[in-house]
Amino acid sequence: MTDNAVVYYKEKKAGLLKKTEDVYEFEYDSDYLKDAEAKPVSLTMPLTQKKYFSERLFPFFENLLPEGFLLDMTIAKLKIDRNDKFNLLQYVGQDTVGAISVKPLKEGA
């Protein structure tokens, strides 16, 4: 997995989620912001041209992750460190129950 993931709202590219050594960053896509029907990915992350920063994975995205038995099964199957929430999100975030999905950024995209 990469350290960059594309966040979609109902199949529309809403923004880019990045993980660096020190911080997580989320930025809405400029084309998404121009869409009159654009909705924020979370009430805690209103639509804005400014970037959001956090020392840990943003709570909204962390809440997309499985818990308990499902988390145990997922990390065992994928062989991902339980604390590597960003890579875990890129796997499980591709098929969520709600309107938001998170997919790894493909090279050259």
Regions found by a protein language model. Give the residues of each.
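Phosphate/dinucleotide-binding and metal-coordinating scaffold of catalytic cores
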Residues: 1-109
